[in-house]
């Protein structure tokens, strides 16, 4: 499979905390999201100036242009975090990085605090995956805890979409062939054995075995998980 890729992770709550502190109206917010999504930070600053946003908010939004990179940018983000909500968003990203470090995935991870969830339904973690040989992300996703409510049921959720055309283009240009028909292994673990489960899964994957891990529910027997 793909060996050269980057997963860019953000937290919509950080961006949203900046919005809340700026006290801008809905129309300005929509335009601001669009500008920052297009990485037009100069235009974003002009918009905030016209909207008479707080100077501290303008400074925080301007800093977003530099909030892209390795785990070290999370420390920089703390310097401009305007609220406890923003700090919690950063702490959440740090926790995710700690788990990914157990997987030894650090080299594939970057952070982008300017991710705003332009569609408006993301509520926390948001991510995109990139590789060379494509013009766009090959995977996009995140949390959308309130989206299902619009269809009649309150249910937290997380999901992602694989952009098949971009993925196939990347595989072709990188001359990668994918075998099919392989069976997958499932590793069940108790909550306190997460690190052991990850290490075992890495051993299996190192032998080209498709492997998934899943925390065992305390009220379920092993038979419940047998296909």
What does each model-found stretch correspond to?
Residues 8, 22-25, 37, 82, ...:
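Short capping loops/turns at secondary-structure boundaries
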Residues 1-2, 47-227:
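Positively charged, Gly/Ser-enriched RNA/tRNA-binding surfaces
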Residues 6-9, 110:
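A structural signal for short, well-ordered beta-strand segments and their strand-loop junctions
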Residues 24-46, 105:
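Acidic, His- and aromatic-enriched active-site or binding-groove loops in soluble protein domains
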Residues 1-6, 18:
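Class II aminoacyl-tRNA synthetase-like tRNA-binding/catalytic domains
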Residues 17-22, 122-123:
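Short acidic, glycine/serine/threonine-rich loops at helix termini
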Residues 9-17:
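Short, conserved phosphate-binding/catalytic loop or strand-edge motifs used
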């Amino acid at each position: 499979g793909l060996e050269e890729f980057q997963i860019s992770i953000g937290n919509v709550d950080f961006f949203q905390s900046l919005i809340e502190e700026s006290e801008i109206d809905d129309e300005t917010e929509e335009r601001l999201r669009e500008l920052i999504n297009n990485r037009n930070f100069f235009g974003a600053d002009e918009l905030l100036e016209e909207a008479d946003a707080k100077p501290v908010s303008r400074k925080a939004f301007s800093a977003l242009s530099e909030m892209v990179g390795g785990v070290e940018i999370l420390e920089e983000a703390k310097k401009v975090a305007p609220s406890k909500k923003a700090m919690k968003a950063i702490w959440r990203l740090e926790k995710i990085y700690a788990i990914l470090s157990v997987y030894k995935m650090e080299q594939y991870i970057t952070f982008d605090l300017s991710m705003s969830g332009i569609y408006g339904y993301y509520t926390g973690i948001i991510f995109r995956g990139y590789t060379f040989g494509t013009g766009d992300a090959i995977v996009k996703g995140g949390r959308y805890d309130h989206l299902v409510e619009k269809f009649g049921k309150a249910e937290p959720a997380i999901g992602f979409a694989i952009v098949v055309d971009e993925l196939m283009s990347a595989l072709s240009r990188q001359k990668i062939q994918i075998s099919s028909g392989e069976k997958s292994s499932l590793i069940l673990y108790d909550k306190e054995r997460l690190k052991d489960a990850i290490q075992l899964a890495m051993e299996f994957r190192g032998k080209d075995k498709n492997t998934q891990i899943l925390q065992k529910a305390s009220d379920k027997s092993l038979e419940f998980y047998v296909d």
